[in-house]
């Protein structure tokens, strides 16, 4: 056991985590040169296209150190985006140490900080690594100072490497073996294994990634899931080198995969403890804290026949993504679908793309909303995650919106722009600290503004230099209203949105204008209105298409023309009473962009 090292690689987006993982795999000979490809651990197509890591991946490698010993390295490549920080915290729970990778050109960024604090809270050994030293813009001395100044860990002898060229990567491994402690645990005690992650394989059923904390797991053992009490047979187990390799046993301290022929998706939840049925452990390992979704949106299949397969797809995805929340929802405009909870807008986009790609579904998404706390006049407190669930205005005593605490790191030059943006988003400044030419800003901004497009706008006002980390702080009373959209005097529930009263006029007007361009013209006038309660705040009309009934007259008497026009008018009137308006899918997507600057 003393030769096992479990560690994660944590860093801000694009600081070179996945490339460093590639080099480590190459040096330890996990894959032959022929099988080696860039970002070998980003196995999803989506990850490769966007160049980001979404799922944490684990690998077991053997490394022969300079002291002549051979060490077994179990390492986990983690995502850098703020939306996937729960993936990072789950990976860290399986480790004794973490490599904090910092780009020697960019320096410390917000996510570097957030991930590092997560690691420190879990009492992990953090080893700083300065990456990309081959860049002309690299300034390792300055960045080492920044790490000490902002993060507060000793970085005087931080390892310098370039993952792209491979310089210094062996030093990283040597330092790792030296500084990260071996796993603690009792190899002879009762089995306790923590489920770090799981996914669904069409042939094998549920595959789980486990970290053995105590005891040993052997092939063919009877294994019990502690939360449900069900027992399964350990059919196959093994490690990733990144290829799946079968083993006969997983020893104490190792990280590996396990197949128990679990067909039920909820059979082995992530964060649960596995133990042996013969000699069970007394208590379960502390799991992970449940992540609360921050953004909710309705997802509806375009054709209602897909509802069943959509439900199965969500089930399989939620197994792989523990933070995805969903419940059935029906809408008069869109039929049956699900209300889903996500951690942020990127997470929502990724889930939607994965559903469309991996499960061949066509989906319509409604506007994302956050959870509001509503105190009714009957003094009840309810939580509302969809505009259609909001009680009528006169039943609401107080409406509270979630406030996010946003930590931003940015160069001084962009401070003015960023502060202007935060004020525009109804933010309140709580802290500002200067570190060299970097500024650390803390603002409290309503969550609804953060999830809409704050991140994109922050990046564009600071030319990509500012970085952001946010978390939920509290609920705060606020003057929010629901804006309804009426088409021909009928409310369309899927188009409603909740917004602050100050912005409601402009949002309503903008929405109505957008809808006017998107709804195809019919044979009769279509009135589109935005309303708060019964008060109409904006209106526009999609003009009717009409045939020129006078074309056949050629001159002729005025009364003849009047008769024809009158007849047409009556026909249109009848049509309007019975006519239905078909809303195109673009109309629903239009709301997603309301309130965003059309840059």
UniProtKB/Swiss-Prot annotation:
SUPFAM superfamilies registered for this protein in UniProt: EF-G C-terminal domain-like, P-loop containing nucleoside triphosphate hydrolases
EC number: 3.6.5.n1
InterPro entries linked to this entry: EF-4 (IPR006297), EFG_III/V (IPR035647), EFG_V-like (IPR000640), EFTu-like_2 (IPR004161), G_TR_CS (IPR031157), LepA_C_sf (IPR038363), LepA_CTD (IPR013842), LepA_IV (IPR035654)
PROSITE patterns assigned to the protein according to its UniProt record, in alphabetical order: G_TR_1, G_TR_2
Reaction(s) this enzyme catalyzes, per UniProt: GTP + H2O = GDP + phosphate + H(+)
Enzymatic class: hydrolase
GO cellular component: plasma membrane
Molecular function as annotated in GO: GTP binding; GTPase activity; guanosine tetraphosphate binding; ribosome binding; translation elongation factor activity
Record family assignment: Belongs to the TRAFAC class translation factor GTPase superfamily. Classic translation factor GTPase family. LepA subfamily.
Role of this protein: Required for accurate and efficient protein synthesis under certain stress conditions. May act as a fidelity factor of the translation reaction, by catalyzing a one-codon backward translocation of tRNAs on improperly translocated ribosomes. Back-translocation proceeds from a post-translocation (POST) complex to a pre-translocation (PRE) complex, thus giving elongation factor G a second chance to translocate the tRNAs correctly. Binds to ribosomes in a GTP-dependent manner.
The protein's name: Elongation factor 4
Species, as recorded: Salmonella typhimurium (strain LT2 / SGSC1412 / ATCC 700720)
């Amino acid at each position: 056991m003393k030769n096992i090292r479990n560690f994660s690689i944590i860093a801000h987006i694009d600081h070179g985590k996945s490339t460093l993982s590639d080099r480590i795999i190459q040096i330890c000979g996990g894959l032959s040169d022929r099988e080696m490809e860039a970002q070998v651990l980003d196995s999803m197509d989506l990850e490769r296209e966007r160049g980001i890591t979404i799922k944490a991946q684990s690998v077991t490698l053997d490394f022969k150190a300079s002291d002549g010993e051979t060490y077994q390295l179990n390492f986990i490549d983690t995502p850098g985006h703020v939306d996937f920080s729960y993936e990072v915290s789950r990976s860290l729970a399986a480790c004794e140490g973490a490599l904090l990778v910092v780009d020697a050109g960019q320096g410390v960024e917000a996510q570097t900080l957030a991930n590092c604090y997560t690691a420190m809270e879990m009492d992990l050994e953090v080893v700083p690594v300065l990456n990309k030293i081959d860049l002309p813009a690299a300034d390792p001395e300055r960045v080492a100072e920044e790490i000490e100044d902002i993060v507060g860990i000793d970085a005087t002898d931080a390892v310098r490497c370039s993952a792209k060229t491979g310089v210094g990567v062996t030093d990283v491994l040597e330092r790792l073996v030296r500084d990260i402690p071996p796993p603690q645990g009792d190899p002879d005690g009762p089995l306790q294994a923590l489920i770090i992650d799981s996914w669904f394989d069409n042939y094998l059923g549920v595959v789980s990634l486990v970290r053995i904390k105590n005891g040993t797991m052997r092939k063919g053992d009877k294994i019990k899931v502690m939360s449900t009490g069900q027992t399964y047979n350990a059919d196959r187990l093994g490690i990733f080198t990144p290829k799946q390799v079968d083993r006969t046993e997983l020893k104490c301290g190792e990280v590996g995969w396990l197949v128990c022929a679990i067909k039920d998706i909820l059979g082995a939840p992530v964060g649960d403890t596995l133990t042996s049925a013969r000699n069970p452990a007394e208590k379960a390992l502390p799991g992970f804290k449940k992540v609360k979704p921050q953004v909710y949106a309705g997802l509806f299949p375009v054709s209602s026949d897909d509802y069943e397969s959509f439900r199965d797809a969500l089930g399989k995805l939620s197994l792989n993504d523990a933070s995805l929340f969903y419940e059935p929802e029906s809408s008069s405009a869109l039929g049956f679908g699900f209300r889903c909870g996500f951690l942020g807008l990127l997470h929502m986009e990724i889930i939607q793309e994965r559903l469309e790609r991996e499960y061949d579904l066509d989906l319509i998404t409604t506007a994302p909303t956050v959870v509001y706390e509503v105190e009714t006049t009957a003094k009840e407190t309810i939580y509302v995650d969809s505009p259609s669930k909001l009680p009528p205005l006169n039943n609401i005593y107080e409406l509270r919106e979630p406030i996010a605490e946003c930590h931003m790191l940015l160069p001084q030059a962009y401070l003015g722009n960023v502060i202007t943006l935060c004020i525009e988003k109804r933010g309140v400044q709580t802290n500002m600290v200067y570190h060299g030419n970097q500024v650390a800003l803390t603002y409290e901004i309503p969550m609804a503004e953060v999830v809409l497009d704050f991140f994109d706008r922050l990046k564009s006002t600071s030319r990509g230099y500012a970085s952001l980390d946010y978390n939920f702080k509290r609920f705060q009373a606020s003057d929010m209203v629901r804006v309804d959209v009426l088409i021909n005097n009928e409310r369309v529930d899927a188009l409603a949105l909740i917004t602050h009263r100050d912005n409601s006029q402009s949002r309503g007007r903008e929405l109505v204008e957008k809808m006017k361009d998107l709804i195809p013209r019919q044979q009769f006038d279509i009135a589109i209105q935005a309303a708060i309660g019964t008060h109409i705040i904006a209106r526009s009309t999609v003009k009717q298409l009409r045939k020129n009934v006078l074309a056949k007259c050629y001159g002729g008497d005025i009364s003849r023309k009047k008769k024809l026009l009158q007849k047409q008018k009556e026909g249109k009137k009848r049509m309007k009473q019975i006519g239905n308006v078909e809303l195109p899918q673009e109309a629903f997507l239009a709301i997603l962009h309301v309130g965003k600057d059309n840059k």
